[in-house]
């Protein structure tokens, strides 16, 4: 059984809550277990908890769940690009998948609501990657 850790952003929680629920349902559908869930203030705060989860022997992959909505500045782009870069670095450092279930940047609230399936897609990706890496 694949064991997943979720790191979930509280910012735009109405949207990340829906993303989390779809991710939970899909993990159960795929027969994966989610023994760890960590809430963080925002997407930019994800790297340290991701690192801690990746250090655990009973975590096969980490799922990130977040939503970054466009504002009046380029803040959304800076947040997502830097988080994605560091998340990828951690995946390579620990040799475990970290699936990007983060919607944004450059989207409106309405677009974000239409993208709540990103959490589900991240679970799908992580479970596939764990199984394929185990076969190498």
Swiss-Prot record:
The keyword Manganese does not apply. (2S)-2-hydroxy-3-oxobutyl phosphate binds at residues 72-73, 115. One of its GO terms (biological process) is riboflavin biosynthetic process. It catalyses: (2S)-2-hydroxy-3-oxobutyl phosphate + 5-amino-6-(D-ribitylamino)uracil = 6,7-dimethyl-8-(1-D-ribityl)lumazine + phosphate + 2 H2O + H(+). GO terms for cellular component: riboflavin synthase complex. GO terms for molecular function: 6,7-dimethyl-8-ribityllumazine synthase activity. Keywords: Riboflavin biosynthesis, Transferase. 5-amino-6-(D-ribitylamino)uracil binds at residues 11, 43-45, 67-69, 100. It holds the Pfam family DMRL_synthase. InterPro entries: LS, LS/RS, LS/RS_sf. Its EC number is 2.5.1.78. PANTHER family: 6,7-DIMETHYL-8-RIBITYLLUMAZINE SYNTHASE, 6,7-DIMETHYL-8-RIBITYLLUMAZINE SYNTHASE DMRL SYNTHASE LUMAZINE SYNTHASE. Belongs to the DMRL synthase family. Forms an icosahedral capsid composed of 60 subunits, arranged as a dodecamer of pentamers. This is 6,7-dimethyl-8-ribityllumazine synthase. The gene is ribH.
